[in-house]
């Protein structure tokens, strides 16, 4: 008879994402197989990477992933282990730890040691008693006591995973780093409160992912996927209007102190796509939200009530040059010339700028294990070198993301890249605000 896993489909997907898009195959279930260690080890020993899951009362799931083969007896060689806990009915409530451990197996008990002592012990013959030490309990944010009875124990084989301890550690700690970035962005305030909200202009060729980046930012803050901005794959720009999007924090509901300004896509033709003569007006804050672009007729300042002297709050404070990473090396000379012209306008206005490369496929390999810097492999890419040369921009301001497209749920590594890119844009904006001449800082009101 086929045994059905107690893990829900959503819980399986969360755990698979935790390990970098792995797949789970059920090997053992305590209610369907014998409650003894020998039966357990017979099912999962020498099966490769495994995940042992304990279903507890109060809708809590606790488990441990072991990268190496699970031994039949005492293992003196440390194993790469990731510990996790899930709270049912809370799809984002996952906590995880990365520990090097040793495994002891005998006829009555399964014990997993970490360097600080006993971490987990399982005794099926005593009614499947499970015990976790304080280190694991605190790290997994559990308050269950030291000895408790699991409702069910399941063991899964884990396939499609990279056999690399560093990669596993990176995947396991990604959620924690995502939380740190999110907290930092929630606490962000523009430099010396010169403006209440920083404005970031997204500019780039048609199909580069400008609107998709806004959708990705909004999704990451909301905690679920959303697609407010219309996106598409037409050869001409889907975005016809100038849009100023505010971002709300999904937790507090408050509007965050930054806006993303979406523009029409650039095209090679002189009377197609965003007219680059419109750029200075946008940068200076002379263009209202929902202004309809006309590629054949450059913008006139009369469209804005602040055209004579727009307040600082209406101006652009950072520009993000958005480029599809797979199209960078095939950009025409005309398109590169347009990007250089826009960069000159940005510099002349004293505005900070970054480059944002989208549609990165191996997005989990962009940042190093500490999530602090891009890897050397990434910074040496020809696309990065070309963008650096064209825009005369430091490597630190060349950012990479993989926008959400067809996914149905958020991924920590994608969110990390989105948050890291946004953080660098805000830093560039703050640098520009700090460098403003006194006469400009005096033109602040109205907020």
Curated annotation (Swiss-Prot):
Residue stretches making up the TLDc domain: 1-159
GO cellular component term of the entry, any: cytoplasm
Keyword Cytoplasm recorded: yes
Upregulation: By respiratory syncytial virus/RSV. HA-28 antigen is expressed after induction by inflammatory cytokines.
Keywords of this entry: Cytoplasm
Family statement: Belongs to the IFI44 family.
Subunit structure: HA-28 antigen forms a complex with Kb MHC in BALB.B donor cells. Interacts with FKBP5; this interaction modulates IKBKB and IKBKE kinase activities.
Name of the protein in question: Interferon-induced protein 44-like
Source species of the chain: Mus musculus
Taxonomy of the source species: Eukaryota, Metazoa, Chordata, Craniata, Vertebrata
């Amino acid at each position: 008879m086929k045994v059905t896993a107690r893990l829900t489909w959503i819980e399986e997907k969360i755990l698979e994402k935790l390990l970098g898009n792995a797949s789970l195959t059920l090997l053992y279930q305590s209610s369907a197989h014998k409650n003894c260690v020998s039966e357990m080890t017979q099912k999962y020993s020498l099966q490769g990477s495994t995940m042992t899951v304990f279903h507890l009362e109060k809708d809590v799931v606790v488990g441990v992933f072991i990268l190496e083969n699970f031994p039949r007896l005492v293992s003196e060689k440390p194993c790469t282990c990731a510990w996790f806990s899930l709270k049912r009915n809370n799809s984002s409530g996952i906590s995880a730890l990365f520990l090097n451990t040793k495994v002891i197996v005998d006829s009555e008990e399964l014990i997993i040691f970490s360097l600080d002592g006993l971490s987990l012990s399982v005794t099926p013959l005593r009614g499947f008693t499970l015990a976790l030490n304080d280190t694991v309990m605190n790290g997994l944010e559990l308050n269950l006591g030291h000895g408790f009875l699991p409702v069910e124990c399941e063991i899964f084989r884990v396939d499609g995973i990279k056999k690399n301890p560093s990669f596993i550690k990176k995947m396991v700690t990604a959620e924690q780093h995502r939380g740190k970035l999110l907290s930092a962005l929630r606490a962000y305030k523009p430099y010396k409160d010169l403006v209440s909200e920083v404005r970031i202009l997204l500019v780039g060729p048609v199909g580069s992912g400008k609107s998709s980046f806004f959708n990705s930012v909004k999704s990451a803050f909301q905690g679920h996927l959303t697609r407010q901005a219309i996106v598409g794959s037409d050869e001409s720009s889907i975005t016809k209007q100038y849009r100023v999007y505010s971002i709300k924090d999904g937790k507090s509901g408050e509007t965050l102190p930054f806006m993303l300004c979406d523009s029409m896509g650039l095209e090679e033709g002189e009377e197609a796509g965003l007219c680059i003569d419109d750029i200075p007006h946008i940068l200076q804050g002379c263009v209202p939200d929902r202004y309809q672009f006309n590629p054949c007729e450059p913008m006139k300042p009369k469209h804005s009530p602040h055209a004579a002297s727009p307040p600082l709050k209406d101006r652009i404070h950072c520009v993000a040059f958005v480029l599809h990473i797979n199209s960078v090396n095939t950009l025409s000379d005309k398109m590169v010339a347009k990007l250089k012209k826009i960069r000159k306008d940005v510099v002349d206005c004293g505005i900070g700028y970054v480059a944002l490369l989208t549609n990165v496929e191996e997005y989990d390999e962009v940042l190093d294990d500490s999530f602090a810097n891009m890897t050397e492999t990434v910074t040496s890419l020809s696309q990065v070198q070309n963008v650096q040369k064209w825009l005369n921009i430091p490597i630190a301001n060349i950012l990479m993301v993989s926008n959400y497209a067809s996914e149905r749920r958020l991924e920590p590594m994608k969110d990390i890249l989105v948050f890291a890119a946004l953080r660098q844009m805000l830093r560039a904006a703050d640098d520009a605000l700090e460098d403003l001449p006194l006469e400009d800082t005096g033109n602040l009101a109205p907020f």
